[in-house]
Amino acid sequence: MSENPYRPTVRTQAELERAWRHLMEPLGFGGHSLWLMFIEPDGRVLPHLTQIEDAVRPPTGEEEASFVEFLRHLRDRLGSGGRLVFLRSRPGRGGPNPDDLAWARSLYAACRAAGMETDVVHLATDDTLVPLPMDVALAEPA
């Protein structure tokens, strides 16, 4: 008997947070990662989660430029209306620190530069999972 993959419909921020909670709980992380989830134009999540490990420091300008090219390639493959969403996970307790906010700023900027649709970036630590809205990320100094 095969198990059905997890494919929720994500149309709102609440649904996105619920999907991330389902995928990340129980919380507790041994390293810093960036997680990518693809959402189809109809809001259905693709049954594949991508993890980029060792994402400790926010990307440099050169790394962000490479990521923009990667996102452009994905945008072309996903087609119109698809979007890519992100969650940063790391060990430790509490809400966002300056590096988390720098990661969120970088992800928002890369998506904007690549023309890739995205939603609110999320952060998961050992004891919390929270959204990092663009206005909050941009309000913090670089």
Segment roles from a protein language model:
Residues 31, 78-79, 114-115:
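A structural signal for short coil/turn segments at secondary-structure junctions
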Residues 57-98:
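Short HxH-centered metal-ligating active-site micro-motif
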Residues 1-67, 128-142:
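Domain-start "cap" segments at the beginnings of catalytic or binding domains
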Residues 23-24, 71-75, 107-114:
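Hydrophobic, Leu/Ile/Phe/Ala-enriched alpha-helical segments that form helix-helix packing faces
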Residues 1-2, 100-142:
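Divalent-metal-activated hydrolytic enzyme cores
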Residues 1, 53, 74, 78, ...:
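Bulky hydrophobic/aromatic packing residues
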Residues 34, 82-84, 118-120:
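Residue-level recognition of the N-termini of beta-strands and the immediately preceding loop/turn
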Residues 37-39, 87-89, 122-124:
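Short beta-strand segments
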